[in-house]
Amino acid sequence: MRTFSNIIGGGVLLLTSMFACNDPMEVDNAELEVWADEVVVPAGKSVVFNISGNAKLISFYSGEWGNDYRYKDAGRQLPIESLELNFGSLLSNAKQKSERYVLLSTDFNGNYKDIGAIQKATWQDVTSHFTLAGSNNETESGTLNLDDFVIPGKPLYIAFRYLCFPIASESGAPSWRINRLLLNAKTKEGDMKVADISTTAYTAGFNIVDFGKGTNMESISIVSASLVRLQGKDGPTEQGNEVWAISKGIDTGVLPLLPDVAVPVKGVADADIKQY
């Protein structure tokens, strides 16, 4: 791949001559000339770029937010001014006894396989700041500002803790589902998503820690692309269990953004263009 760029008035036209094969081959040099009749224009006014050459791919970076050539390989690092957390939850089989908590830690060591490490960590109970579901109807938690719970330079772990108890009913233990979560940052550029329940770059990275794992009380808790479900064993049980869902360590000081993306101007299969 060969890449060249032309910079005009703060914008960047990027051309790429691409080829790939198993054996070496001769290729023509890509050529590109770009010029504009005006290189200094007021904001909001259209600019026409004149283009000549044989570039196979042409992309454009205007220099605007999200379209800046300087951040094409690595995104911006935005200082976080404030953090807020909210989520939605449901509780099925709610007639059976359970206890549910929302906890935060800044000193958990991130070892999800070590129950002792979880018990040793300091967990701040913030349950009372939220509204938890009491039925199978989705319940909005409300929003909590986390500024009083973070420590500069230390990662933040978010945890949902679930306790179930011996049950005589065939219906089994309650199922607590967190089916939406948003950790939001306030920055100088406005509100920005930090983490959610997903498989995208924003994933909060929840891990299930089942205190009954490997025993006859092992839970059926899961983390999927769209929810966290904490649920004890099905059917009658003679013992209870404790299950946690703990997020990855989240940076509370700086928000790393994804790289900026160019606007496509010309593709390999497209005819040559004269203006953009």
What are these regions (language model features)?
Residues 53-57, 91-93, 210, 216-218, ...:
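Extracellular acidic, Ser/Thr/Pro-rich low-complexity tracts
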